[in-house]
Amino acid sequence: MRKIPFFDYPGIYNRFKGEFDQIFQDVCSRGAFILQKDLEKFEIELAHFLNVKHVLGVADGTNAMYLGLQALGIGVGDEVIISPHTYVATANAIQMVGASPIFADVDQNYLLCPTAAASKITKHTKAIMPTQLNGRCADMVSLRALAEDNKLFLVEDSAQGLGARYGNEFAGTFGSFGTLSFYPAKLIGCFGDGGAIMTNDDGLAKKMRAMRDHGRDEVGKVTMWGMNSRLDNLQAAFLRLRLKHFDEDIDRRREIADRYQRGLGNLSEMGLPPSSDDSSPHFDVFQNYECTADHRDQLRSYLQDKGIGTLIQWGGVPVHHFDGLGYGKEKFTDLSNTDRFFERCLMLPMNMSLTNDDVDYVIESITDFYSKSNKQ
């Protein structure tokens, strides 16, 4: 039976096998593992790509958010407004600094709605933190204006947003800081965990650079409390290679998304991600291709029988319904758009191993499912 996996991690290795193996030998032969030149070069190259002043490699995306919030002084008694359509890590990072995550509903793009965010502002609010999900930016012009008007920090969880733009600005560069994840499933992933923080604030960058290394400054003197959250030099070396090929990867992901759009766009049973044409402020990079589907669970089972891997994000449960976390349910009002979305959401395969024939097979299988369903 034909197999089209949702993830294809071996495919990433096989694509660059010779180069990855050479990088491993080079870094190991130099014994260059922690805070070495490969990390410094990666930070410089990524900053150049994003047109941002500072990039700091850290242990993972959750650490990146935690360090950024901590550096801004957000803590006990404070509130941070986020979208409920996000990974639990976003809320966890806020809890880790002692603050409270406050959920505001999503808009038609299933990203943080500026109007909903405005309705959740209180005297305790310190920041607005949109998640740039699936490779698409939220309405950053409106969110930035909302933050400025209310004297709030604007910070970004851009774990899934590397390369996405709103207007001429990249995800992760709109506010005080933005964060990235290099988890293997991300747009450029490493062989394990990794993350980064982006900022244009010199003082904030200096503080976070010390905080990621036990509070030590550039000469090794401990100047503040910190933690161990350094992106390994070996991972940075791998990521430098991935970054070199990132533009071609984005082009291919957009081609796959366009093929899905053309093949599935006439199915009334499905809702597809918005397309970003030249008139749109969005430039999407499609980390995931998340749609909505009638008879979602039956469709997913049918595709599985066809050898097609799919995924329901966060296990089909938005963060505000994670009962064991005790966020304070009285603050989880007016999230109906999110709840409706999670009843129908489904992610189709979107990885760099997909061929056009693979995509067409997915399209044909979905079309076949609805054709059979409509005849019953």
Predicted segments with their positions:
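Short beta-strand-to-turn element immediately C-terminal to the catalytic PLP-Schiff-base lysine
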Residues: 180-181, 195-200, 240
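PLP-dependent aminotransferase-like
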Residues: 70-158, 165
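A short alpha/beta connector and helix-capping loop motif
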Residues: 111-120, 168-178, 360-361, 366-368
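Phosphate-binding glycine-rich loop
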Residues: 32-79, 93-97, 103, 169
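N-terminal "arm"/small-domain region of PLP-dependent enzymes with the aminotransferase-like
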Residues: 1-32, 37, 349
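Structural detector of well-ordered beta-strand residues that form the stable sheet scaffold
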Residues: 56, 81, 102, 154-155, ...
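Conserved active-site segment immediately N-terminal to the catalytic lysine
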Residues: 156-191, 206, 218-223
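PLP-dependent aminotransferase class I/II
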Residues: 10, 37-44, 49-53, 127-131, ...
